[in-house]
């Protein structure tokens, strides 16, 4: 899978752009604040129907314009697919081969992307919400049912939290309705926990192998899912649902007192273990970065296994955050395998030696021009 063409209209600082890409490596060079990250964001939004940088869609629309339009042509092994996403005050409209999709969940998965930005190096040591988002966004691309279940869960969770607030402030007194919401939340929550455990087990297989290679056999990487549910390992979906229902009953008074849902996959976490030690607590910064890199690279192989297509890799100024050895491993792993978009003010000697015949684009205030050689930018 690769993105052949991209068209942008009124997306951030891009007024009207049409560009054709290489199926291999595309290097975006230019000074800061010229639009390199905006271009990567547009590809991410085309794939995921949401931004990784903002929850406010209006920020993606050029100032004083009514809407932004992103179009892309995706090459897949079974043929080409045309994608279109319109972002306006009324919301988003998504089309696949000119046919509008009723729900965005029906659209996501047409173009699979993996984004690796400097903040992703905090995947290991960041807040639990960072790791939950990582699981949900990456797994959601390869499992439409998981994405649908997640949407259902979040809708019921909002209802339940609202009702808990009403019980807390005595605006409501009917606990039977709370039990109904608890059962609905347990239905979708149990499926999410089960799928996450399954996903992490599959991802670990690739991540451990890559991490072992990077560390020259010195370290093994494992994932440990941490659930607010007391017993969850080795349980079926039905058993997980029953456990959730029972724990919601036990915690009812506490949840009413606090006015929020204290149990469920929205509060779960993942631990990264190196040789059976928690790297979040005991690992050096170098070990944490290597673990994050291993996890990101593992996604490539897992997506290939699940979808039979390699995803697109978006590297947003991440090479500057990695030393020479990690740069080498990253670039060797993706070479001649994954379409890659790489933003940088200028490439290191290591990167220039390893990247084979890249297509180079200079970004200057929302204008894109193709170049023939690397130039190091002065900041």
Swiss-Prot record:
One of its GO terms (cellular component) is cytoplasm. It is found in: Cytoplasm. ATP binds at residues 30-37. Its main location: cytoplasm. GO terms for biological process: DNA replication; DNA synthesis involved in DNA repair; double-strand break repair; SOS response. GO terms for molecular function: ATP binding; single-stranded DNA binding. Keywords: ATP-binding, Cytoplasm, DNA damage, DNA repair, DNA replication, DNA-binding, Nucleotide-binding, SOS response. Belongs to the RecF family. The RecF protein is involved in DNA metabolism; it is required for DNA replication and normal SOS inducibility. RecF binds preferentially to single-stranded, linear DNA. It also seems to bind ATP. PANTHER family: DNA REPLICATION AND REPAIR PROTEIN RECF. This is DNA replication and repair protein RecF.
